[in-house]
Swiss-Prot record:
Belongs to the alpha-IPM synthase/homocitrate synthase family. LeuA type 1 subfamily. It catalyses: 3-methyl-2-oxobutanoate + acetyl-CoA + H2O = (2S)-2-isopropylmalate + CoA + H(+). This is 2-isopropylmalate synthase. The gene is leuA. NCBIfam families: leuA_bact, PRK00915.1-1, PRK00915.1-3. SMART domains: LeuA_dimer. Transmembrane segments: none annotated.
Amino acid sequence: MSDRVIIFDTTLRDGEQALAASLTVKEKLQIAQALERLGVDIMEVGFPVSSPGDFQSVQTIARHIKNSRVCALARALPQDIDAAGEALRVAEAFRIHTFISTSSIHVESKLKKSFEDVLEMGVSAIKHALRYTDDVEFSCEDAGRTPIDNLCRMVEAAIKAGARTINIPDTVGYTVPTEFSGIIQTLFNRVPNIDKAIISVHCHDDLGLSVANSIGAVQMGARQIECTINGIGERAGNCSLEEVAMILKTRADLLGVHTNIRHSEIHRTSALVSQLCNMPVQPNKAIVGANAFSHSSGIHQDGVLKAKNTYEIITPESIGLPQNNLNMTSRSGRHVIKHRMESMGYAESSYDLDHLYGKFLTLADKKGQVFDYDLEALAFFSQIHEEPEHFKLEYLGVQSGSSVLATASVKLKVGQDLVCEAATGNGPVDAVYQCINRITGYEIRIDKYALKAKGEGKNALGQVDIVAEYKGRKFHGMGLATDIIESSAQALIHVINSIWRADQVAEQMERNVTKTDKINTESV
């Protein structure tokens, strides 16, 4: 049996299902490229049949990712598998992941079928997927609550049909470690062709046991773990990639296995996913929480000062957490910025140095001192605003006070034109938003508004995240500035630019459909 555990990341499929607002294609590609740098073996990036947008995202990622295998999900239905196969065709190598429920409650209550019907559907789905690729994964949904005899039959039939990987999900996070490990052990003991496939596990965290269940399964012979960055996912989330990766590394003495994960990329990848998905990481979260390497007890502090390994079993450096927080000023040159970015794990090709340096100088003039966390925030926001902006903030002014009606004046660049507007509102942010809505013509409803400091002290950058609804769709917007009113304006403009681009894509697709229909009519 191999001593390598395959890491199957499903942040962009199972993880994204938990988000209030869907990620854009560009944001999904950013995360996919980060996962590739991290060294995941397989990345499941969407469910192509679910929507044209998901199909496009899967296709775009499949076209760009070269060093990780791209995978798409499909129910055990021909149309799902065809959509996945078509979306993935552009990849150098890809996997189709098809699934069907196997527990009695799912088979009888959800599918309204017999287990024999489900068995036949699973086998047919695998054979259909093999038309597109020889790398087919099959999942027995709700395996944790499936009668063991039925589970053994399904696994044996799936392997015989040609599935290379068999996934055993604890779909509702119901099992405990000894129970789940026992299921894996029973499969190895009772399924005669088990050696012809890799056994995978996909554990949810409803009872807080997803990581423990996954590690226990590895001890019983499973060699693929399905997980997400920061453990994001439906309900209580999924098995956390960073936790299993560091467990397998730190306790290699006990577990005797390894992964291909580049552990120094963990912090950076976690931060990116948290930012783009608008899902803050809890401070006390293992590995990537803000307090993961903090010591407040006097006894602990004394021990760490004498020898770090008294209370630290892993180091901040091992996950890529920057330790040398050098302060920079407007007198710092480009070479300093480049050096600090390199020290934080950013290759020069991943950012525009001239653009970043310009943003740095502007911030340094406002703050005086700029720190690594400021620089990282600037780099991140430069990346998300790389696309041409149809609406751009040119000027913002507000007047407000305890006994003054808040008034705002805003000037936006709309295409090539400058448009001004003034408005009053229930506070300065509301007044600014009234101006922006009038200029752009979009009626936006703000569902969520969150403000957080990026950095330390009164001069910290203010980041604003909003979730907005427009015509039944949710959009996520972000803004960053030393002035929280300005960052609030940027966040709404970010949303409106996303809506505008989505409208442009929809119009183009409609024109293409009309053109195709016209050609078909003429040919008839």
